[in-house]
A protein has these predicted regions:
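A short, hydrophobic/aromatic-rich structural module that often spans a beta strand
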Residues: 28, 314-316
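Conserved helicase RecA-like core
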Residues: 1-303
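Acidic, serine/threonine-rich intrinsically disordered low-complexity regions
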Residues: 317-377
Length: 377
């Protein structure tokens, strides 16, 4: 059995895969399963199958080789909602509080975000079991989380895309994508955790306003169209002040918040599709406040990238330059540039040495606010 073979191809290991298949007996039966009919899957079929027969659970599925359309379960109810970056934490908390009797899977873009949201929400006691799953956990921990979540009737699992493929959780009611997927195929794999077999399911995609057009176009190009809903701000619970108190009292949680922020910005920066993921203009300070931080940490890899862009930028006409070199003031960013590489290896990109500004006041909402907040209007 070879799992995630299409991803192996995507990562450039086609020659290695061909060599492995070359050692198999020539007389054999090969079954190729995929949730998505993508070009990589078609390439894999050509590589490993002879005279293949295409079988789909959807009678209307396209049998055209290289079809770009992706199939979704007919019993999946899906929506997207626009959500400012600084509002995501409040929206997630409000959603959980209004769906306590559901089984929910929430996707975030990085392990550090998963860990922070799990630890922060756990301290706030939402009234339903919380679990988290990501690739930085040890194998026995991941297996334990998968087993426990599978057995629970009502629970929330925060996860990276580790949970998007190859896992079959029984009876998930909701899949919430707090961060946009990298592409349409990832979207399909995420929402495919619900509405499995004959059961129904719901999917909600939260998009920044800057992500809306690019993401919807990318999905539409693969045959996926999602209706929009509006989040009622008046019905959304605010937990910013509570997170700020927790971060002040618990240095570990504050540190997790800083790492989560940097990790999110890095994930946006490293995404290839810049029509969707735009690091410029991200409200970093407002996002920091929403995580309970009094100020955003310095993001060193971003400073390095900005410095590199300035160095590579064309020089202004000489007429606009000062004749005296001493009149040109340095921005000082070069002094902040570190020599470490750009890998997401931990904490080298988080600079917490700056003095903390005074606490930021966050408006409190009424206690009986509910997430009909995410009212489907």
């Amino acid at each position: 059995m070879l799992d995630e073979a299409d991803r192996i191809l995507d990562m450039g290991f086609s020659r290695t895969l061909s060599a492995l298949l070359g050692h198999l007996p020539k007389s054999r039966q090969t079954l190729l399963f995929s949730a998505t009919q993508t070009q990589s899957v078609s390439d894999l079929a050509r590589l490993s199958l002879q005279n293949p027969v295409f079988i789909s659970t959807d009678a209307a599925a396209s049998t055209v080789e290289g079809s770009t359309h992706l199939e979704l379960p007919a019993n999946l109810e899906q929506h997207y909602a626009l959500c400012a970056l600084e509002s995501k934490t409040n929206v997630l908390w409000s959603f959980i509080k209004s769906h306590l009797q559901n089984k929910t899977l929430i996707f975030l873009s990085s392990a550090k975000q998963v860990r922070f949201v799990f630890e922060a929400f756990r301290r706030l006691h939402p009234g339903t079991p919380l679990l988290h799953l990501h690739g930085q956990q040890k194998q026995h921990t991941r297996l334990d989380v998968v087993t426990r979540f599978g057995r629970m009737q009502h629970a929330v699992l925060f996860a990276t895309d580790l949970a998007a493929r190859g896992l079959d959780f029984p009876s998930i009611d909701w899949v919430v994508q707090a961060d946009a997927p990298e592409d349409a195929a990832t979207y399909v794999h995420r929402v495919g955790r619900t509405a499995r077999y004959a059961k129904g399911g719901h999917a909600l995609l939260l998009l920044l306003p800057s992500e809306e057009q690019g993401m919807l176009e990318a999905l539409k190009a693969r045959g996926i169209e999602i209706p929009s809903i509006k989040i009622r701000a008046s019905k959304t619970l605010s937990i910013g002040d509570q997170l700020q108190r927790l971060a002040f009292q618990d240095p570990e949680l504050k540190y997790l918040a800083q790492r989560a922020l940097v990790s999110y910005v890095r994930s946006v920066y490293l995404h290839h599709d810049k029509s969707i993921f735009k690091v410029e203009g991200l409200p970093v300070e407002a996002f920091a406040a929403s995580l309970g931080l009094a100020g955003a940490p310095k993001i060193r890899f971003l400073s390095r990238a900005q410095t590199k862009d300035r160095k590579n930028a064309p020089r202004a006409p000489t007429a606009l330059q000062s004749e005296d070199e001493g009149d040109v003031q340095s921005s000082g960013t070069e002094d902040e540039v570190a020599d470490s590489d750009e890998r997401d290896s931990g904490d080298e990109d988080v600079d917490t040495s700056q003095d903390e500004p005074p606490p930021v006041a966050v408006e409190k909402q009424g206690k009986d606010a509910k997430v009909s907040a995410l009212s489907f209007s």
